[in-house]
Amino acid sequence: MNLRTPGGRGVRILPAALLLLAGAGILGAADDATTTALPADSATATSAPSQNDEIERLKAALAEQQKQLQTLQKTLENQQALLDKAMGSQSTGKTGTFTGIGQVASTTPIVPVAPLPAVAFPSPIARPRPQAAAGAPKNPCEAPPDTNAVPPYLRLGNVCIIPVGFMDLTPFWRDKNGASQMGSNFGSIPYNNAVNGNVSEYHFSVQNSRLGFRVDGDWQGTHFIGYNEFDFNGTGGATNYAVSNGAIVPRLRLFWIDARKGKIEFLAGQSWSMLVPNRKGISALPGDLFYSQVIDINYIAGLTWTRQPGLRVLFHPNSKVTFGIAAEQGDQYIGGSAGGSAITLPTAYAGLASTQLDQGQNVTLASYLGTPTPAPDFIAKIAFDPNSRLHIDLAGIETNFKTVNPTLLSQHFTKTGGGVELGINAEVIKNLRLISSNFWSDGAGRYLFGQAPDLIVRADGSLSTVHAGSTIEGVEARVKNTLLYGYYSGIYIGRNTAFDANGTTRIGYGYSGSPNSQNRDIQEITFGFNQTMWSNPRYGAINVMGQYEWLLREPWFVAAGAPKETHDNTIYFNVRYTLPGSMPNF
């Protein structure tokens, strides 16, 4: 029996067909009766009792067929009731396996998870969801589309695409003019004896807005992801940003491809460094990383991070352990970027800053990758996820440096540095997480947002790495539609000094008489909230956010009468609209 849609043509045709068959049976019986009643050439007329017997037999046949029709009608009604019940439970439950709002640029952990309700096309006829046929593709982007629901992703060929991004408006206030736009330059807070230390600032910014896309697919059992993300913190030559147009410049943040088959995973492109603490596994997806929940686009002092090109290979022995190795873009960094102070070079090697060592030259596009590097930075990492409430990762990094004596080209100087990072992210009680991230290095200070140099140069041209470390201790709590957070973090930069060739002039970092821009430590206390005001998987979400930030920095050397430290206060407020979209489960 082939039943079609409830209330459709198939259900109406079946009773009609049955009635037609019953009528044909009745007519056939009547024809038989008539034939029996007609006399043959050699027969005599049938007696009256014989005709009565035929009539009774016809009545009995009609009664039996009537019972059969009633039984069939009752069966149809029962099947109709079962279909109605099934459609009722389907329309009130969740459709799909998506988590709704959440896979949005780099704020996935910020947005509270919203369930995805059924999203059906208006239709007077309820249609059951088509069942997957035997041997149907496992790739949801190749499966037949569900004509009842509006999917939270786009289909292009055999891949799924979602937009990722949000639009931000961020008013912010600082009690000192850091001249650093929206992000904090942790290492260059003005001192109170400087003009900028006595001038406050208030600005509006949309620079943190982001646009991008994510592509998912499955080819012969290999699940691949392509991810792209831009913000508007790029640099440009125009000078009318605050005068007439506010023409901020897009900047590439992320652009990578990841492929996984079985236990092996491979990633290539520009991504967050594998040294960034994770929330889950060793995934490069922004929502699986920990870089705090703050509004400050430079995040928090002490976070180990960078976004740079590289390659990585991951091995998943099981669902609870991941091991990875990566080769990422190296840099012979001696300070001078993002508010970090540069080292003092020996006189004979002062030219290295513009030819062989990076003293902030790699900040602008004109000199991007202008500084040579002998090898990539190599990173190894292992992550443990025994359950959804606990994540632990341990990472190690190797850095390599090489210079040439500009007056004696046959003389080379090399040095190897490294560091270790330990991160813990634990949900101690429901909706309350404690976070700890700790880093110690000897020649990897660049990964602390450039606040520490990697190395110094001695008078003879030899290289010496600089100790640098950091810590982050924080808490994150979710109360209904609001995320609350608070962090303490800090950076320590070790002293590494030497004498110049004259034997009296000090060089390096943190020496007696060094500029007060050469910091010994930077500390931060910050807290804030992120509240989801409205969320709909078909339209996106609106969030309001707030953050307070207190920063302190202390130099290695304090001249007579000079301030021993400086600090500032910053208040951020943010209104965000997040684009809708989420990927199906593969």
Report each predicted region and the residues it spans.
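Transmembrane beta-barrel outer-membrane domains
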Residues: 156, 202-208, 245-252, 302-306, ...
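Outer membrane beta-barrel
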Residues: 128, 143, 148-188, 193-341, ...
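Outer-membrane beta-barrel "beta-signal"
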Residues: 566-586
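N-terminal periplasmic/intermembrane-space "pro-region" immediately following the signal or transit peptide
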Residues: 27-180
